[in-house]
Amino acid sequence: MWQKIKNIFRRNKRLQTDVKIDEQERISIIERACKQVSRGVFYSTVIIITSFLPVFLLTGQEGKLFHPLAFTKTFILVIDALLVITLAPVLISFFMKGKFKPENSNPINRFLERVYEPIIRACLKYRKTTIGVNIIALLVSIPLLMSLGKEFMPPLDEQSILFMPVTLPDVSNTEIKRILQVQDKIIKSVPEVDQVLGKAGRASTATDNSPLSMIETIIMLKPKSEWREGITKKMIVEELDEKLQIPGVVNGWTQPIINRINMLATGIRTDVGIKVYGQQLDSIYKLSERIKSRLENIEGVHDLYVEPVTGGKYIDIVIKREELSRYGLTIDDVNMTVEAALGGAPFTNTVEGRRRFSIQVRFAEDFRNSLDRLKRIPLNSPDAGTIPLSAVADIKFTDGPPMITSENGILRGAVMFNIRDRDMGTTVQEAIDKINAELNLPKGYFIEWSGQYENLIRGEKVLLMIIPVVLIIIFLSLYFAFKSVREAFLSLVTIPFALIGGAYMVYFYGVNLSIAVAVGFIALFGIAVETGVVMVIYLNDAMQQLVKLKGNSRETISKEDIKE
């Protein structure tokens, strides 16, 4: 707006040489310029806000991440538009007085004009060549974009590593403690590691369902200035993974924050998970193993692991009712004794300051894990005195599911894996194609892709659905701004050409396409259209001034005048 008003003042002074403009005429010029610019400002604001409509419609993690950006930008644009048409004219009336210096008096302007003028003259002289070069650059950028990988969000370096190995479901407390200590010692031997904190199993809360076989070790790294020369975080993970190859343990590598987000959002603790739904746990496990075998040779798939639905150990105690009646016992007598021996029974309370703790008593772990000792659990019979549990019950260890997982009332298993050294979109698409081609699912069984890939697909669907609608709204806004389909199309057609620079930058910088990159391109849409609106407004103004000077005729206006 400031530049627009300055140009109007300069034209008046050129037309009225040595004639002083009075205050009323100066205010009139400011008012006329503001009216001329306000329309472009309004529609530019509408267009930029409209271009961010896809961001407002994002859901899930991507919505929570980018909604603040979209709202902040929108509020700033609305306030800026209000200030441009209200406060700016008032300030201009106070401060834009006196003689105006020519634009070339500024050294920066002189430099820019010196660079820009020969370029624009060459482009106007060779118009077809200029258009052809841009079309070729646009056509080349399309396969470049198509060749880029896809991911949900660019990985963020948390300056820490989360090591999540999984052992066999029937691992004992003693063995898991030994494995945990060995792993911590090996991890601490790497020079870049500052601190190591590992845990096995779950906390004593109802919200933590981690089995004893799942280890979580947080590895805090030293500042990068203290790392060995030339080493990267990826190399540290590879070194640790090579050193931590323990039989019966499947390693898993991720980062603490993103892991918690994945687990809370999808229930999958890796980058990608294949949820297998069905009716029988044994069939689900067999199907999961078949899926795993198809994924083993796919590039980029790491830490491949099948969530166990079998392998848990259970104690089955089958009571013999005839023997119970012979000894004068009831089923409740046996159940209460077994419950106290294995599960524990309240014994007493202890008070420490203002806190009170209950104490339970049960058999030691070695006793509970021994079948012979379990058979000798004493029962008090009113007819025969003390008898062993084996006298009235058959006791045996049986295999079963360590954990039964279901979603929407359907039993579920899972095949989980992380993706490294390759983009998520290409890796998962190859896995989907291979599974669809080589695996026939039984009736009543189906699979569902989850994890970060689930977020990627959801974000893509929203963007692909709403972007065409946004382009239509932008075109209508341009039409109402210019009252011309040709000028509206002229402003809109600059969008794909504006993406050329972004496409080349993303490609040569080695960045995968993601929701974050898509939001960046959306912002570029609005800026490109806004620039087109401003240029069309100035071109129309310049043409109107030319018509006033030379008339609206081919005989009076030459091609050189139009170029000038």
Regions found by a protein language model. Give the residues of each.
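Extracytoplasmic/periplasmic membrane-proximal domains and adjacent transmembrane bundles
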Residues: 19, 23, 252-254, 285-470, ...
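Signature of alpha-helical transmembrane segments and their immediate interfacial
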Residues: 30, 35-37, 49, 104-154, ...
